[in-house]
């Protein structure tokens, strides 16, 4: 296992955007009147695009006004502007001159940045001792990246005497705050017994924490742990997985290890490079099957760097010899514009060539073209015909689409029984959409006798595969006790899963559960967050709920204008119970306030048209 020490340099933007006031006319007036704090906030608003269009030039000018009045944070941001050349010409000397006063006033971000200037010799003479001093000042205030750098300085003896015990202490402080590089180096300390007793289990734990955050060196080290069985049971598959993750980030040692895995067949099938070499030799002699294989290797980047242009070239060579699988892959290239300019007409032509030879996937694709009018005039009858041909060969996607055709009466007379039959065929092959559809049929008695227990079973199968609609419906089953014993905890769990995938109804239900503490500890802040997500997607009940939040100050500051805004949107969206609240709030607001809100509401409906 190899040691990796890296000094991280660059601009850090630590202040959370949510903690700062957004741009507003009142804030701007304060700033123009000379209020230094307001000037800084206006600068940040322009810098971050918080309530106003990003404008680094404006940000720089407002930071300058505030910085010259002694606002520490503004001095730090002046340093950032000069360091990055944002809003002004890049000038490390000026960056250094602004970081310094902010650092001397105790701002940890500025202390880190000043240390970085000394470390890199930017804007000042390179001085590792000063760099260490300022990194340490920031680290002692809890800044994770500074703690990591102090650990590195102690480890390497940069700017201070080498001290593995201190290195360990600072790596641990940063690692416990989630810094991935520190977690990796802490793993190294445990692995090599530097500054702490050697402990492979602890080394594995910290490598894994960093690897799961995407740190390439930790992924490589974790691969070694699995490969050699250090701190964990030996597992070639896991070793391969982590080497691959690191290799795909460009880490040379991991790429070498990954090559070894392919070469000797550890954790992966043996010999992709050799396979590629022989495919190429045969393909160049005109064998259609091997031309296709070579094209596929280029297409998926297996054993060779991914190259859609080369994939297209080899698919075309094989397709022109009449190979169906190459013809439909060539169709894919044209359809998605991979290796060639997107061309639905050509995609349709090649799908048709393969479909007429009986290739099931091509038949499905041809049906898809007819259904969507891609490369051919839309024709549901033809779509149905080709979906059926593919479905009868067992193509799961075609079975799903054939089920849809029967369910909605597209290209064929509506027939819930047939829809159910084809959904079931696909569901039994494990397709999540089909499992969801089967559940829906059982829940509504469409094509089959209504059966809540079966509906629940199929929703669960689809939900466990991550299908969002099924996760929502499963939540409903648990919430209402349909097909399963009522269980608010499980209902909450599945609503949350669906909500996080963007299902508006699930977001509303999740907000409801947080609001009333059903299946989860009551939390108005979380309730507000999820109601807002649902409201933005047009759920009128959620819009009304937001109005209540702002009206009564639950989980958010009381704000009658915002309450009026959401009440009015919900009312115009069909939530008639909001009418009395709209009228009540109108009596509270001024004429100008009402006009402002009504204009905002009109804008909302322009960007959120009713379906």
Question: What is each of the regions a protein language model found here?
Answer:
Residues 577-611:
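Terminal, low-structured helical/coil segments at or just beyond the last alpha-helical repeat
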Residues 45, 66, 81, 102, ...:
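TPR/TPR-like alpha-solenoid repeats
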Residues 7-18:
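Bacterial N-terminal signal peptides
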Residues 1-4:
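Positively charged n-region of N-terminal signal peptides that target proteins for export
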Residues 32-35, 46-50, 55, 63, ...:
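Short helix-capping/linker turns of helical repeat alpha-solenoids
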Residues 41-48, 77-84, 116-120, 149-156, ...:
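Hydrophobic face of amphipathic alpha-helices that form TPR/SEL1-like repeat modules
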